[in-house]
């Protein structure tokens, strides 16, 4: 199958079954890649010069506990000032906001625990805290130098942690920290998103080990915060009132529910007690307005009477409410019955929005934050100048210096694969900048469509029969050109309304038209009908469906019709194109299965919904066709619980499709952060092995386990302006980096496989956690790049390998399968039917696709 020069793959190394509790060690980097033309780049990594000293680590215990980090930082700052003469002297300790304190010189307390009392001046009365300090360990920076130069097998985690705390200490006092980033409200100009939210800009900062050097990774970042404003204005934004004056009546139930959803969990501060701006967290919104909402009020006589909130404010605060018809906020603990009228509350500044943004907010956010690569590069350089780490007294205390120029890196631009089409001329496409087209080409294997139907859920007056007829003709023409002939008119073409009519209509179609291959469904914008079409088609009846937006029917373009054909052909079992067999790497010499895996979690703040795990596996030698498996699992659980059973299903399916047993398994795992590498590898590698052994006692294919990461802050820029590509001035598709900014000893690389269209391209980061197949760097990089060209939905190279992308689509589709018509809004992926507490079994059943759908690429 493989002809052409290139190394022959080493046979898989024997895989020993490890002792329980044994930590798998990621393989060392085998070599550095050499193929491709070289390209000079700059990365947003800044070299750190670190002295070979010891740092002293102390543990703090602050009582009362559970203070926010911001308060803890104030306590420590007061403590260092107050006990300067007795303990701290001129030392500048750094603190992580929880319990870790580091100093450059030891404190004069020996190994004993020291108890101190610290007073914080408060708005009302002073607050007193008890702080204990205890020596933990000496952190050796010499050990770090040894690890970076390869003399030590692994980078000591505690040294990275200590350096991180040093570098973050000052920014944490100045800005609002969120994860590894720092934010501030934009001075002078606000960037509203609507719904009481706005964009805050800031920067990401993290300390990263790399070859020979520690690096500081700096990037610009942006996130959504709640606007500091009166709650009355917040209500108007959330419920789309021009002003509160137009709302003279109490809120309706649906308005109250919408408002509650937005404000629950937020902090508000009161405005009716002068300087005493007490803060509270909102736990609910009352059903009754302030004029009717009562609470038990204890009188001076000791008697308790029911009093309305409006009356209480009038008697106690001499405040006649302007909006007594609006509800109150219930704050603090639910059982305490503390109610505040909306008009005496403001939203506290600096609260990050963790709830999912609406589609409109997301697109506003992208418009506000997308920067061309050269602009982003300039912004990062500006950031470095203003951060001036070399004058930061805490950084200097530890003898650290940071270079203020970006790191120069040499990358390589890999050759794209040739793409083979079918038809008479068997045309070959050569991607240019990650893109090719289908003009004068036909699908490798096109499906002939004889029996098909149209169901139009758009109103007839907007999407007329003339529109449908014209759309049908255009679609048939384009499909014929693409080698997927749609024969004759649809056997059925009717209008329908609402999600409830989907199932009866589809049942009628299935029972009436033998051999029905496809239902084309026309939708009027965003609608609950989509989720229902997919639920019924994929899971209930096993019918292939293709949804089309009404606007694309009213105005057809060859491009949208061609894209539809790409999806339809694959759903019906066709093959759009394949990698040119002669150009594939040696791994294809023996039967190999490519697996892609991903876990998607429900949006933050949604505690009831399950996480969804999806694994897909290739089913042919190209590899082009894939099969999917999907499971629901515990909320926010990152490890794929049922992986062994899922992989077993896919291996059986592969054997049925090809009559071969794979000798190699290449597993691309998406959605794992660095902190979880060890855990995920240990559990999931064992699960894959278990799947093999359960099929056959001695079946031990070589496994390569690669984590794919897109959520990182590495950005690469062309040094030479002439190398920049497109309007956004990005790096070319195929740019690969495996030196200087990568791991000092482990096998990882960056690959930007797609052409950046908007904003700055984000290269994907690949980290090999296990490799029985002993890939060379070149071979794994080329294989990965080629797999990015096999994604069926478009004629472009995508940013991650097709199997990983498909796993993401499968999990995303399962969210729609979980939409529960009775209880969920149809906000697409914000929904998964758990709102009414359906049990795990019901959820598991809901995501299982129909027998007839199982072997198809229904998710395409």
From Swiss-Prot:
It is an enzyme of class 3 (hydrolase). It comes from the Eukaryota. The modification Phosphoserine is found at residues 388, 825, 829, 832, 835. One of its GO terms (molecular function) is core promoter sequence-specific DNA binding. Ubiquitous expression in 9.5 day embryos with highest levels in forebrain, heart, limb buds, and branchial arches. The modification 3'-nitrotyrosine is found at residue 2. GO terms for cellular component: cytoplasm; cytosol; dendrite; extracellular exosome; glutamatergic synapse; nucleus; P-body; postsynapse. GO terms for biological process: cell differentiation; gene expression; miRNA metabolic process; miRNA processing; miRNA-mediated gene silencing by inhibition of translation; miRNA-mediated gene silencing by mRNA destabilization; negative regulation of translational initiation; P-body assembly. Residues 518-819 form the Piwi domain. Its cofactor is Mg(2+); Mn(2+). Residues 588-591, 651-661 are annotated as: Interaction with GW182 family members. Disruption phenotype: Embryonic death with a strong defect in neural tube closure and apparent cardiac failure. It catalyses: Endonucleolytic cleavage to 5'-phosphomonoester. Residues 230-349 form the PAZ domain. A divalent metal cation binds at residues 598, 670, 808. The modification 4-hydroxyproline is found at residue 701. It is found in: Cytoplasm, P-body; Nucleus. Belongs to the argonaute family. Ago subfamily. Interacts with DICER1 through its Piwi domain and with TARBP2 during assembly of the RNA-induced silencing complex (RISC). Together, DICER1, AGO2 and TARBP2 constitute the trimeric RISC loading complex (RLC), or micro-RNA (miRNA) loading complex (miRLC). Within the RLC/miRLC, DICER1 and TARBP2 are required to process precursor miRNAs (pre-miRNAs) to mature miRNAs and then load them onto AGO2. AGO2 bound to the mature miRNA constitutes the minimal RISC and may subsequently dissociate from DICER1 and TARBP2. Note however that the term RISC has also been used to describe the trimeric RLC/miRLC. Required for RNA-mediated gene silencing (RNAi) by the RNA-induced silencing complex (RISC). The 'minimal RISC' appears to include AGO2 bound to a short guide RNA such as a microRNA (miRNA) or short interfering RNA (siRNA). These guide RNAs direct RISC to complementary mRNAs that are targets for RISC-mediated gene silencing. The precise mechanism of gene silencing depends on the degree of complementarity between the miRNA or siRNA and its target. Binding of RISC to a perfectly complementary mRNA generally results in silencing due to endonucleolytic cleavage of the mRNA specifically by AGO2. This is Protein argonaute-2.
């Amino acid at each position: 199958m493989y002809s052409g020069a290139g190394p022959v793959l080493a046979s898989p190394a024997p895989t020993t079954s490890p002792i329980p509790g044994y930590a798998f060690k990621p393989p060392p980097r085998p070599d550095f890649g050499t193929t491709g033309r070289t390209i000079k780049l700059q990365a947003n990594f800044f070299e750190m010069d670190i002295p070979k000293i010891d740092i002293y680590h102390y543990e703090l215990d602050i009582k009362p506990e559970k203070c926010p980090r911001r308060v803890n930082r104030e306590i420590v700052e007061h403590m260092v000032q107050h006990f300067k003469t007795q303990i701290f002297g001129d030392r500048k300790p750094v603190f992580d906001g929880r319990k870790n304190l580091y100093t450059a010189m030891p404190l004069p307390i020996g190994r004993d625990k020291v108890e101190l009392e610290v007073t914080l001046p408060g708005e009302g009365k002073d607050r007193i805290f008890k702080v204990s300090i205890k020596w933990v360990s000496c952190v050796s920076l010499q050990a770090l130098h040894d690890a970076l130069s390869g003399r030590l097998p692994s980078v000591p985690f505690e040294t990275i942690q200590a350096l991180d705390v040093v570098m973050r200490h000052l920014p944490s006092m100045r800005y609002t920290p969120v994860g590894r980033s720092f934010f501030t409200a934009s001075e002078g100009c606000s960037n509203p998103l609507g719904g009481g939210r706005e964009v805050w800009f800031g920067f990401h900062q993290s300390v990263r080990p790399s070859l020979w050097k520690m690096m500081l990774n700096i990037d610009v970042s942006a996130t959504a915060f709640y606007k500091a404003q009166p709650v009355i204005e917040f209500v108007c934004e959330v419920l789309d009132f021009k002003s509160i004056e137009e709302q003279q009546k109490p809120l309706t139930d649906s308005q109250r529910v919408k408002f509650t959803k937005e404000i629950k969990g937020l902090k508000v501060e009161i405005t009716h007690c002068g300087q005493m701006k007490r803060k509270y967290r909102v736990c609910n919104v009352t059903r009754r307005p302030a004029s009717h909402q009562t609470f038990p009020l204890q009188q001076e006589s000791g008697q308790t009477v029911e009093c309305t909130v409006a009356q209480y404010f009038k008697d106690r605060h001499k405040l006649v409410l302007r909006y007594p018809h609006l509800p109150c906020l219930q704050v603090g603990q639910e059982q305490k019955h503390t109610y505040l009228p909306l008009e005496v509350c403001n939203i506290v500044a600096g609260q990050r929005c963790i709830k999912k943004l609406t589609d409109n907010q997301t697109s506003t956010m992208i418009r506000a934050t997308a920067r061309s690569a050269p602009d982003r590069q300039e912004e990062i350089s500006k950031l470095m100048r203003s951060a001036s780490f070399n004058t930061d007294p805490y950084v200097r205390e530890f003898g650290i210096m940071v270079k203020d120029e970006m790191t120069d890196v040499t990358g390589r631009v890999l050759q794209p694969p040739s793409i083979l089409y079918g038809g008479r001329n068997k045309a070959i496409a050569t991607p240019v900048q990650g893109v090719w087209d289908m003009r004068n080409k036909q699908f490798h294997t096109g499906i002939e469509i004889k029996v098909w139907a149209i169901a139009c859920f758009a109103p007839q007056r907007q999407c007329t029969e003339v529109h449908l007829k014209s759309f049908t003709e255009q679609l048939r023409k384009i499909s014929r050109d693409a080698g997927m002939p749609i024969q004759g008119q649809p056997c059925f073409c009717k209008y329908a309304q609402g999600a409830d009519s989907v199932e009866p209509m589809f049942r009628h179609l299935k029972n009436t038209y033998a051999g029905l291959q496809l239902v084309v469904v026309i939708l009027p914008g965003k609608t609950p009908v989509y989720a229902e079409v997919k639920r019924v088609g994929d899971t209930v009846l096993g019918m292939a469906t293709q949804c089309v937006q009404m606007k694309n029917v009213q105005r057809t373009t060859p491009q949208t019709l061609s894209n539809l054909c790409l999806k339809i052909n694959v759903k019906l079992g066709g093959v759009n194109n394949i990698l040119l067999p002669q150009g594939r790497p040696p791994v294809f010499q023996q039967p190999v299965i490519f697996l892609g895996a991903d876990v998607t979690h429900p949006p933050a703040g949604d505690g009831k919904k399950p996480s969804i795990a999806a694994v897909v596996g290739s089913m042919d030698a190209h590899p082009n066709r894939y099969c999917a498996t999907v499971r629901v699992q515990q909320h926010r659980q990152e490890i794929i619980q049922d992986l062994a059973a899922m992989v077993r299903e896919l291996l059986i399916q592969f054997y049925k499709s090809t009559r071969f047993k794979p000798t190699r398994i290449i597993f691309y795992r998406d959605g794992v952060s660095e902190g979880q590498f060890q855990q995920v590898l240990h559990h999931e590698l064992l699960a894959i092995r278990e799947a093999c052994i359960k099929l056959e006692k001695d079946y031990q294919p070589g496994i390569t386990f690669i984590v794919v990461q897109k959520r990182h802050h590495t950005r690469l820029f062309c040094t030479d302006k002439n190398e920049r590509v497109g309007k956004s001035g990005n790096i070319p598709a195929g740019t690969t980096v495996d030196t200087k900014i990568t791991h000092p000893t482990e096998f990882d690389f960056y690959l930007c496989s797609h052409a950046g269209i908007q904003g700055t391209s984000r290269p994907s980061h690949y980290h090999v956690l296990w490799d029985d197949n002993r890939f060379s760097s070149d071979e794994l990089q080329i294989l990965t790049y080629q797999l990015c060209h096999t994604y069926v939905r478009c004629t472009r190279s995508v940013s991650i390998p097709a199997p990983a992308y498909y796993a993401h689509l499968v999990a995303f589709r399962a969210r729609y399968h979980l939409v529960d018509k009775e209880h969920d809004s149809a906000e697409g992926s914000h929904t998964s039917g758990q709102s009414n507490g359906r049990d795990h079994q019901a959820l598991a059943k809901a995501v299982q696709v129909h027998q007839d759908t199982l072997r198809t690429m229904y998710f395409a």
